[in-house]
Amino acid sequence: MKHLTEMVRQHKAGKTNAIYAVCSAHPLVLEAAIRYASANQTPLLIEATSNQVDQFGGYTGMTPADFRGFVCQLADSLNFPQDALILGGDHLGPNRWQNLPAAQAMANADDLIKSYVAAGFKKIHLDCSMSCQDDPIPLTDDIVAERAARLAKVAEETCLEHFGEADLEYVIGTEVPVPGGAHETLSELAVTTPDAARATLEAHRHAFEKQGLNAIWPRIIALVVQPGVEFDHTNVIDYQPAKASALSQMVENYETLIFEAHSTDYQTPQSLRQLVIDHFAILKVGPALTFALREALFSLAAIEEELVPAKVCSGLRQVLEDVMLDRPEYWQSHYHGDGNARRLARGYSYSDRVRYYWPDSQIDDAFAHLVRNLADSPIPLPLISQYLPLQYVKVRSGELQPTPRELIINHIQDILAQYHTACEGQ
């Protein structure tokens, strides 16, 4: 499986193509992505982060082997070929264990890498940029690179042991701020400088040499940088090509390397396409997909309230709010302001902290109740027009069935379509 190295080769040959990475563990988001890739006959890159999935279960309760099994089972049920499915691990390193001494955190990171590689993940993002309990802040490029090289060695050995060949593709480096959207309000963002990008590359090259890993350099396909894109709770910082032009030109000097851009969620279609042209040829998207899922569910809940007596309504919105108030750990340190501001953020924020709550059994039951209520009889077209106008057009043209599930899937696919178009190339 060489989809990524082939994509990079074509991009370097001037095709201005790219691939997007779906960063979500939600079954409906993954179904939407698999069906979209299937319809367009493209490979699909799905990534799990070190927060979501790790050897202890992460916040999803899944190990890498569990996640792979879950995705592959879904792909099989939708007749999507497994050889077109690429699984990636994002921010793999001591991220989850920053409160531990470095030696202990890195021992856990070794096991994290082993568990991802043994499970068949082929795209590995090595990120050791975070300081552990007894580390200086910030870490030097050399320490970050030495730790990444250590993990690369573990990855290569694990891959050979389990699969008899070393065919992993690596991403190095990190963006600022933290993964998953900024915590604070933003107005402008510093773009990674060419010098900083070069320093990261050279430090990693030197560290890999010291580990005897020279041969894997062509499989280091991407460097994560900050092109100047980010979102907070209510704002998006749009890509400004002029600010990233020096960075964009710098990567042209590396024949097997492109950039990976994180937090591209909510960028305009024009910005996504320009990012690809400027060699940010792996576009990560996650919160924007669960945001679209949430939009569709809120719309269906509003339709339900119009159609169904209150006493038999699912009450999805209220159940969600009650659970988030009862278990505030996923949003409390992110959302600030008075009670009303925090209420709005819980429901509507771009950072979409609500995505952590969909697996909750009470919320899942309310979701199932909502779908049952709306599946009993056809949803009136005027209500689809009112609450899901983009889907209404497709329902009227006959290309979309007006069932709750299909309306949700299609609304998510509207976002995927923007990424697909940006990545198509010339």
UniProtKB/Swiss-Prot annotation:
Any Pfam family matching the protein: GatZ_KbaZ-like
Any one Gene Ontology cellular component term annotated for this protein: plasma membrane
Pathway: Carbohydrate metabolism; D-tagatose 6-phosphate degradation; D-glyceraldehyde 3-phosphate and glycerone phosphate from D-tagatose 6-phosphate: step 2/2
InterPro entries linked to this entry: Aldolase_TIM (IPR013785), GatZ/KbaZ-like (IPR012062), GatZ_KbaZ_carbometab (IPR050303), TagBP_ald_KbaZ (IPR023435)
GO BP terms, alphabetized: carbohydrate metabolic process; D-tagatose 6-phosphate catabolic process; phosphoenolpyruvate-dependent sugar phosphotransferase system
Source superkingdom: Bacteria
UniProt similarity note: Belongs to the GatZ/KbaZ family. KbaZ subfamily.
Function statement: Component of the tagatose-1,6-bisphosphate aldolase KbaYZ that is required for full activity and stability of the Y subunit. Could have a chaperone-like function for the proper and stable folding of KbaY. When expressed alone, KbaZ does not show any aldolase activity.
Subunit structure and binding partners: Forms a complex with KbaY.
PANTHER family: D-TAGATOSE-1,6-BISPHOSPHATE ALDOLASE SUBUNIT KBAZ, N-ACETYLGALACTOSAMINE PERMEASE II COMPONENT-RELATED
NCBIfam families per UniProt: agaZ_gatZ, PRK15458.1
UniProt name for this protein: D-tagatose-1,6-bisphosphate aldolase subunit KbaZ
Organism whose genome encodes this protein: Escherichia coli O9:H4 (strain HS)
